[in-house]
Structures are given as C-alpha cells and as structure tokens.
Amino acid sequence: MSVCLGVTKGIAVSSLGIYAGILTTGTICTYMVPVDVITKHLNSVVCRVGEVASALGLLSTGFFSLSYFGAPSHLRHPYLIYSALVAPASALYLWAISRCNHKCHAKSKIAEQGKTNGDNKTQSPPLGDSVVDLGADSKVPSGHPPVKEGAKCPMGNAVVTNEPSSTDYARPAGCQSKFAKHLAVVTGVAIIGFLQSVIGVYGEPA
C-alpha cells in the first residue's frame, strides 16, 4: 500500500471514528437529557455539533471514495465503499424519518385542534404561549447565517407542512423517545462501519 493511499485511508477512518463517537454521545444525551432542556438551552450546542458531524461525514465519505477509486484494481476492497456510504446513508435516514415524523405530528395536531375547537370554539390553540417563548429564547451559534423573522427551520415541522414558522415548537417526550431510537439505529450503523473499516485497513497486506 502506497504512502498516499495510506494517508487517505487514515484520514477517512479517523473521520469516521470521530463521527461515530459524536453520534454515540448524542444518542446517550438524547436518552438522558429532558427534551425541554435540549430545545430551550442547548440549541446552540446541538447546532454546532451537527455542523461538526456533517463536516466529518463529508470528509470521511470523500476520502474513502478517493481511497477506492484512486487505488489500483487489486486494492479496491469493498469495505472502502461500505464505509463511504455510512455518513450519506445516516443523513438520508434521519432526514426521511424527520419528514415522516413532522407530517404525522402535523396531522395529529390538526385532528386534536379540530376536536378541541368543536368542544370549545373560544379556547386558544394549545402551547400558544410556549411558541412565543421558544422563539424569543432561541439562539444560534456564532457565525451562523442571520435568521430573518418568520424564517422556517429546515428540519422543523413548518417547512414540511407549509404552515407558518410559529407552528414549530418543542416536541413531547414521546417524540423524543422515538427520535432517540432512530438515532440509536444510525449510531449502530456508524459504529459497525467504523469497525469494519479498521479491520479492513489493518487486514490489508503491507
């Protein structure tokens, strides 16, 4: 194995290892930290960690792909492709689950509001005050692009259902539990991908 190929594989494996570590830490925190703490006080941290994880995922995918397509035919091992697909597959899975959950949540919310309005038309929409408070307390990391008034979070409910941005609010504990399970699945995939990449690299002939 050439020095250049060894460097690209080393960067790829290291990036994937840190990526898997971030997902593992995030999964543990999601199970242990209450949802209101995450949404009200850790928005900045979560956003920043997400940016780092995304960068590591791109770095890992890029260098694994470079290691595969830039290597001679007899050194193009399947584990390089499998490892390169870990980050894109994880991101696609979480994106699909997020959109599905937002749509299901929006439908259940509309049904609940319709039932409530039928019983008492003068009753205000649930969590109205919470929406205002969450909007006022939300923070973004330093260097984050400016957020205009009324802008919708790309991972929020409003962008999926074409509703006003005020419909985005903290999800209940049940939703947090479901997301934690999906995050655990992605974490497991990342760990398996990292382990098989390590075994593949050290199992190759020098």
UniProtKB/Swiss-Prot annotation:
UniProt protein name: Autophagy-related protein 33
Region described as Disordered: spans on this chain: 111-130
Subcellular location: Mitochondrion membrane
Main location per the UniProt record: mitochondrion
Gene Ontology cellular-component annotations: mitochondrial outer membrane
Source organism: Zygosaccharomyces rouxii (strain ATCC 2623 / CBS 732 / NBRC 1130 / NCYC 568 / NRRL Y-229)
A biological-process GO annotation: autophagy of mitochondrion
TM stretches of this protein: 13-35, 52-72, 78-98, 183-203
Similarity section: Belongs to the ATG33 family.
Keyword Transmembrane in annotation: yes
InterPro entries associated with the record: ATG33 (IPR051668)
Membrane topology annotation: Multi-pass membrane protein
Compositional bias per record (Polar residues), positions renumbered to this chain: 114-125
Function recorded in the entry: Involved in the selective degradation of mitochondria via autophagy during starvation and at post-log phase.
Keywords of this entry: Autophagy, Membrane, Mitochondrion, Transmembrane, Transmembrane helix
